[in-house]
Amino acid sequence: MPLDSIIAKKSLGVLMHPTCIPGGRVCGTFGRGAKEWIRKLHKHGIEYWQFLPLTPTDSTGSPYSSPSSFALNPWFLDIDNLIEKGFIYISDKENLGPTNQDKDHFDFAIADNLTKKIGLLLLQGWSSQSEERKINFNKWVRRHSWVEDFATFVVIREEFNMLPWWEWPREFKIKNNKFLKSWIKKKSEEILIKKLIQWHLDEQWSDIKNFAKSRNIKLIGDLPFYVSRDSADVWSNKSLFSIFKNGDLIFQSGVPPDYFSSTGQLWGTPTYFWSKHKRTNFNWWRKRFQRQFELVDILRFDHFRGLAGYWRVNGNSKTAIIGKWINSPGKTLLNKVKKDLGGNYLPIIAEDLGVITPDVEKLRKNFELPGMKILQFAFDGNEDNPYLPKNIEGENWVVYTGTHDNSTTVSWWENLDYESQRRIKDEYKFSENPSWALIEIGMDTNANLFIAPLQLSLIHI
C-alpha cells in the first residue's frame, strides 16, 4: 500500500532523537519532556516525529551499532516517572550524582553511572512492590523472550570490563552450557536489574506512544539492516549469522568501491546465513519487526537494498574491494512480515539512497513502499538528478532536507562553491536563510510527507 494510503494528505514531520529532549539529568527521557515535545508538534500542525533507533548505543554513542536490536536505551529512563509510581523515593533523587546539563558534550560515564544507580534503587524497592506489579512484570518478560538473552549478555559484558563476547572465557561464549546456567543463577539480582530497567522503559515509552496517538502524532522509527557483531543478537543466535563459534567472521558486510572510495566501505558486521533464516521461517526477523511495531507506527528501513542483495566480503579482508553480490530473500521475508501485520500493507519507508539497482527498485515497488529523497543531494547542476524537486514524480516519497548522515543545511550551504550558490539562488529564489528556503522547497514537492531535522526548525517551533 503506497504512502498516500497511510498519509491521507500532505503532511509534515520533524527528525529529532529523544536525546535532544530537554529536562533529563543527562539527556532526554521518556517523561514529561517528551510529552511537551509532542504537544508542540501538535500545536504547529506537525503530524510525524521521526527518530534514530531507540536501542542502546555502542561505545561511540551510535544506536546503529547496538548491543541489542530489541532493547531500549537505559539513558531514556525517566526518574520522575519512577518516583511518581512509587518505584523509587523522591529522597533518592538527591543521591544520583552529577548531571550532564553543565557540559557542552554528552558524557557517557555520567549516563552509565546514573543507570547503575537507578538500577540498584529499583532492585532495593522491588521486594516491597505489589503482587500485581510483579505479575505484570513476569508476564512482560515471558512475552519478550529477547530480554533474557539481553540481560544475561550485558551482565557478562560488565563482568569482563566490556570486552566483546569473543574475548570472554570459553565457557561464556556459548549460550546454554551447564557452567553458564549455574553462573546465571548466582548473578540473578544483576540480571533482574537489567530486566526491570527494560520493563520500565517499555512502560514509559508505551505511555508516550499512546499520548502521541491521542494528539494524532505518528512515530517513525529506524531499523538498521545489519546488527553489531558484539551484540546479544549474535551471541545468542550464532547460527543465523556468518560467524564462527569463537566469534571470528566468516563473511562481513560492506559496499564495493565507488566514486567516493577506492577501497569501498567495510562495515565489519556479520552477514546473514539466509538459508538458516529460511529454515526457521524467518522467526528472528519477524520477532524483530514485531518488536519495532510495538514501539512505532512507521519504520524507516536502513540499507533497504540489503533485502534485495548485499555485498559479501571475506571475514579476514581489510578492505571491501574483493567481494560478491549475493541475493537476499527480501520478497519472502516482507510477505511474511506483511501477513504478520494483518496482510494489508507494510508501514515501512525504504532507505534507498545511493546507487540503487533495478532489483532493489522492483522490490520497493512490489510492496508499494515509499522511498527517500534528500534535497542536499539535488543541486549538482545535473538536470536529471533524481533528487531535484522537479524530478520527484508521484506522491509515494518522503522528502528530507537532510538526515542524520548529512551536514546541517547551514553547513552544507556554506561549503557550496559560489557558482553553485548563485545557480540555486537564481532558480529557487533562495532567501538569506538557507534552512528555511530548503524547508519551503521540500514542502512544495509532490511528496505526501516532508521531514526536516530539528535544527532547521528550532527558530520556528
Task: Identify the function of each model-found stretch.
Residues V14-P18, R25-T29, F51:
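Active-site-adjacent substrate/metal-binding segments within catalytic domains
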Residues G33-T55:
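Catalytic domains of carbohydrate-active enzymes, especially glycoside hydrolases
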Residues H42, W205-K213, K338-G342, R364-K365:
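Surface-exposed amphipathic alpha-helices with a cationic face
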Residues I459-I461:
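Conserved small/polar residues in nucleotide/adenosyl-binding loops
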Residues L3-K10, L15-H17, G23, T60-W199, ...:
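Alpha-amylase-like alpha-glycosidases and glucanotransferases acting on alpha-linked glucans and related
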Residues K194-V227:
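Conserved, well-ordered alpha-helix/loop/beta-strand core segments that scaffold catalytic motifs
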Residues L52, K218-I220, P224, I298, ...:
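Outer-envelope exported proteins of Gram-negative bacteria
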